[in-house]
Regions:
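Beta1-alpha1 glycine-rich phosphate/pyrophosphate-binding loop at the start
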Residues: 1-77, 161-206
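FAD-binding core/adjacent interface of flavoenzyme oxidoreductases
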Residues: 1-3, 76-183, 258
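Glycine-rich, N-terminal phosphate-binding loop of Rossmann-like dinucleotide-binding domains
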Residues: 10, 97, 110-111, 154, ...
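Short gly/ser/thr-rich secondary-structure transition/capping motifs
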Residues: 18-20, 88-92, 132, 237-244, ...
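A Rossmann-like FAD-binding core segment of flavoenzymes
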Residues: 33-37, 76-86, 178-281
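FAD-site-proximal beta/loop scaffold in flavoenzymes
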Residues: 124-146, 252-256, 260-319
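Rossmann-like dinucleotide-binding core of oxidoreductases
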Residues: 146-223, 227-229, 313-343
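C-terminal, flexible cofactor-proximal segment of oxidoreductases
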Residues: 325-396
Length: 396
């Protein structure tokens, strides 16, 4: 009987995994033994990290959007039909259209979403770069500011040891902001204040979620005159008076609030009953090695949806996708998964407009900070403008 593999989500995780599966299972597909299908809530594919460049007017945004169908191998059936129900007992997902998508193997790659409403006043008084709409809004403010204070805040999920989306992004954008304001000739008149919560995964009273990087950041920030303060866990924002208040009892006024807002899993995941995350955040309980949803034999997950202590970023997905694809292929062929995820993350951080820093880590080793360089920035920009689309197609 033909086996059906269903991928829910047309972002980086879903697209890479679908294409990798199509390649690995081509013999079975050609023998009509396997069927691959993807459902997504959009006909478009968005390269999410591109929004960061829009915030500093280094990109317009349209260059980071492609037709989703064009990124998928022809062997993959694609449907624009937002998932509204997941039934793991009967092995189906229901779309908004009412159509039922049956599966033998399910891959949940639904990502995460901004949940600014979780902090009172943040939606009204804050800005962020985690969406193209948000990036365009904050870009207008950055382009107009002549003097004052830009406050940077970072929020973590309530669920222990789960990071926010793209852990290095607040540092990247703080450094990019310094360069951008310098380009505009107003840096001397604009104060940048970078804050970090008291508790950030395994780190307390630091400036980053991993200790080695946290220890070097004060020197990095001091070199570009960025003020920094730990122990500032954002609790609420007064949008009218432009004041941010922390759980620790501190308050900081601002002219622009650039925040890493709270995040949560997609609504279909939060409504599924599969998550054990705190505060209905929706992160899926994930086996750290196989990337299966814990307790479910035929359901995998990867990317921003998981509850693992690794970055919710493309550099993580790039290594996870092979594990998921290889394990499903092995289960079909041998009856059991064969690969184990080691927590590896590989990326290049944009540490300013013209400086890039390669970074890598896994479950055993934290990021070891390395010098940033123009070559690193060239690598990152090259990936943004071309190599990403090859990676999404499963070619890298």
């Amino acid at each position: 009987m033909k086996k059906k593999i269903l991928i829910v989500g047309g972002g980086t995780a879903g697209t890479m995994t679908a294409n990798n599966l199509a390649k690995k299972l081509m013999p079975e597909i050609e023998r009509n033994e396997v069927e691959l299908a993807m459902i997504s809530d959009s006909k478009n594919h968005y390269y999410r990290p591109g929004a960061m460049y829009v915030a500093f007017q280094k990109a317009a945004g349209h260059e980071f959007i492609r037709d989703q169908r064009s990124l998928l191998m022809p062997e993959i059936d694609f449907f624009v039909d937002p998932a509204i129900e997941i039934n793991v007992k009967a092995n189906y997902v229901k779309g908004k259209s009412g159509k039922r998508y049956d599966y033998d193997f399910l891959i949940l790659a639904t990502g995460c979403e901004v949940a600014a409403e979780r902090i009172p006043g943040l939606a009204e008084g804050g800005d962020w770069f985690y969406s193209y709409e948000g990036a365009k809004k904050i870009a207008e403010k950055f382009a107009k500011i002549q003097s004052g204070r830009i406050l940077v805040t970072v929020n973590f999920p309530k669920t222990p040891n789960v990071p926010h989306q793209c852990g290095i992004a607040p540092v990247e954008t703080t450094m990019m902001l310094h360069d951008y304001l310098t380009e505009r000739g107003v840096r001397e008149n604009v104060e940048i204040v970078y804050t970090y919560p008291t508790k950030a995964q395994a780190v307390e009273n630091g400036l980053f979620l991993q200790s080695p990087t946290s220890k070097v950041l004060p020197t990095v920030f001091d070199s570009v005159r960025v003020k920094h303060e730990t122990g500032f866990t954002l609790a609420r924002v007064d949008p009218e008076n432009k004041i941010a208040y922390s759980e620790e009892g501190k308050s900081i006024s601002f002219d622009i609030l650039m925040s890493t807002p709270p995040f949560q899993a997609a609504k279909v995941i939060r409504d599924s009953g599969l998550s054990k995350a705190l505060d209905n955040e929706g992160w899926l309980p994930t086996d750290k090695k196989t990337l299966k949803v814990i307790g479910l034999k035929n359901v995998y997950t990867l990317g921003d949806t998981v509850d693992l202590p690794v970055s919710k970023a493309g550099g993580t997905i790039h290594t996870q996708t092979d594990i998921v694809a290889d394990n499903i292929a092995a289960e079909l062929r041998y009856g059991y998964p064969t690969e184990s995820y080691d927590g590896k993350v590989i990326a290049v951080a944009q540490m300013g407009l013209t400086c890039g820093m390669p970074l890598w880590y896994d479950y055993q080793e934290d990021v070891q900070p390395t010098p940033c360089s123009k070559l690193g920035s060239f690598m990152r920009l090259g990936f943004n403008k071309g190599l990403y689309w090859a990676a999404a197609r499963g070619m890298l």
